[in-house]
């Protein structure tokens, strides 16, 4: 099967489509508190999924990285308002060192093509 890579930087692709599955690289936003960053990241996720043939209701799995687990409840309040009942993906959330000090959350997504 063909592998399609989109928006490559020489280091990574923002999206890869293979076997009717969309893989998104980690999405971040470096401004605001964890709620604001989560909102912006989820907007990016939704835009990329729509651009490459999927949407948030077709998300299969999500990996969420938080700089500090104290932000878990705040991040979840945004996530829970965004994801629709009945379309909850498999999900993991872990505390992680981030690439930049200003990053509080990073989300990677795997979704089915519509």
Q: Where does each model-flagged region fall?
A:
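N-terminal presequence-like segments and the immediate start of the first folded domain
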Residues: 1-60, 66-114
């Amino acid at each position: 099967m063909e592998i399609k890579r989109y928006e490559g930087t020489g280091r990574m692709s923002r999206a890869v489509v293979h076997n009717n599955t969309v893989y998104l690289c980690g999405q971040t936003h470096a401004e605001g508190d964890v709620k604001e960053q989560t909102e912006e990241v989820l907007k990016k996720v939704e835009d990329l999924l729509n651009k490459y043939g999927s949407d948030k209701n077709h998300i299969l799995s999500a990996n969420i990285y938080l700089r500090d687990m104290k932000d878990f409840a705040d991040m979840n309040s945004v996530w829970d308002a965004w994801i629709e009942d009945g379309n909850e993906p498999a999900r993991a959330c872990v505390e992680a060192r981030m690439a930049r000090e200003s990053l509080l959350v990073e989300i990677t997504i795997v979704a089915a093509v519509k």
